[in-house]
């Protein structure tokens, strides 16, 4: 299954994901980039953290506060990637996600992005299961 998912990744995503799997400093850099003033960098960091959370949720558990904070970013993609990463953590550490509720609820009613609404719905379903 992971091979099929890897085929859908860009070369840059795959390279950063592999680096994050091997190097804790790379994960720390991605967390810092979630707060970057550049939208594209925030989106990319959230995407890689989402992919890493699906592969190895334990490596992303310490990033939960930064992912929750990313739910306040203006662009939908950063928020849906953060929601998807948090959904991957919901079965591992649901107790660390309490502060995500408000951001997920806000995203659930965001009329501008169906992808964002769906990501919020998935998080709330997995978290509540």
Enumerate the language-model features and the residues they cover.
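Amphipathic alpha-helical scaffolding segments comprising HEAT/armadillo-like alpha-solenoid repeats
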Residues: 21-33, 57-70, 94-108
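Alpha-solenoid helical repeat scaffolds
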Residues: 54-55, 91-95, 129
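N-terminal "cap/leader" segments of large eukaryotic alpha-helical scaffolds
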Residues: 1-33
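Structural signature of alpha-helical solenoid repeat scaffolds
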Residues: 50-51, 87, 125-126
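Alpha-helix N-cap/helix-start positions at coil->helix boundaries
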Residues: 7-8, 24, 39-40, 76-77, ...
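Alpha-solenoid helical repeat architecture
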Residues: 2, 34-37, 71-74, 108-112
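Alpha-solenoid HEAT/ARM repeat scaffold
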Residues: 10-14, 28, 43-46, 79-83, ...
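A contiguous pocket-lining binding segment that forms or flanks enzyme active sites
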Residues: 102-129
């Amino acid at each position: 299954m992971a091979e099929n998912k890897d085929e859908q990744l860009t070369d840059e995503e795959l390279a950063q994901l592999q680096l994050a799997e091997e190097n804790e400093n790379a994960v720390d850099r991605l967390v810092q980039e979630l707060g970057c003033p550049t939208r594209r960098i925030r989106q990319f960091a959230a995407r890689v953290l989402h992919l890493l959370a699906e592969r190895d949720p334990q490596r992303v558990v310490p990033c939960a506060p930064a992912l929750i904070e990313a739910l306040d970013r203006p662009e939908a993609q950063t928020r849906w990637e953060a929601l998807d990463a948090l959904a991957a953590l919901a079965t591992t550490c649901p107790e660390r996600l309490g502060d995500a509720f408000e951001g997920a609820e806000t995203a659930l009613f965001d009329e501008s992005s169906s992808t964002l609404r769906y990501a919020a719905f998935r998080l709330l379903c997995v978290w509540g299961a």
